[in-house]
UniProtKB/Swiss-Prot annotation:
GO terms for molecular function: nickel cation binding. HAMAP family: UreF. Belongs to the UreF family. Required for maturation of urease via the functional incorporation of the urease nickel metallocenter. Signal peptide: none annotated. Its main location: cytoplasm. UreD, UreF and UreG form a complex that acts as a GTP-hydrolysis-dependent molecular chaperone, activating the urease apoprotein by helping to assemble the nickel containing metallocenter of UreC. The UreE protein probably delivers the nickel. InterPro entries: UreF, UreF_sf. This is Urease accessory protein UreF. It holds the Pfam family UreF.
Length: 202
């Protein structure tokens, strides 16, 4: 997103809303949300090997090095935050595998595992995953454009129906529907690495 802001493609609240709407429907719905959903299901089945395979798929579908690095960093930070809150055997094993550098711990995989072990239903898991992804994006947009906090709140509020709609759509999909078709985002992410100045990683 920061690339688009510096290239003046995102310069106001309406642009930010349109970008986040597109990001939900065209990017998250066909990539990370499907990964998070599949991680949730595999965790419910206690399928460790399936989760490792899923994480390899997640790693492969992220074409930009910055996107890959950002997903792993977020996953590790999230894992570090929630690890003391969950003592399930699967979650403990996952933490050990990360410690031993056997896995990369991408964010959507960790999120799916954690919410499954937490006992929330799948819809809540997906809605909160999408909500947290979009609120982070909006907060970054508010800082980088820049916009006022009210614009950020209004943007998030306007996207709530899109989050619900996207959740319903993702729940009808599976790994066969995984599709990284957001070429513009991937190119922007690759260009982001070489921006003269930047506030965020991809």
């Amino acid at each position: 997103m920061e690339t688009y802001i510096q290239e003046s493609d995102i310069s106001n609240e309406d642009d930010l809303k349109a970008f986040c709407d597109m990001y939900l429907r065209q990017n998250l719905a066909s990539t990370d949300a499907i990964i998070a959903q599949e991680a949730y299901r595999l965790a419910k089945e206690n399928d460790l090997q399936g989760l490792i395979r899923l994480e390899n798929i997640c790693h492969a579908i992220k074409l930009s090095p910055e996107t890959r690095k950002g997903s792993m960093m977020m996953g590790r930070q999230f894992l570090q935050t929630v690890q003391p809150l969950n003592n399930s055997e699967l979650f403990t094993i996952w933490c050990e595998k990360l410690k031993n550098k056997e896995i990369k711990s991408h964010y959507p995989v960790v999120y799916g595992i954690y919410t499954a072990m937490l006992g929330v239903d799948l819809r809540t898991s997906l809605e909160t995953f999408l909500y947290s992804s979009i609120t982070s994006l909006v907060q970054n947009g508010v800082r980088a454009i820049p916009l006022g906090q009210n614009s950020g709140v209004q943007t998030i509020f306007s996207l709530l129906p899109v989050i619900q709609e996207t959740t319903s759509r993702v729940m009808t999909l599976d790994l066969e529907h995984l599709d990284n078709n957001s070429i513009g985002l991937e190119i922007a992410s690759m260009k982001h690495e070489f921006l003269h100045s930047r506030l965020f990683i991809s």
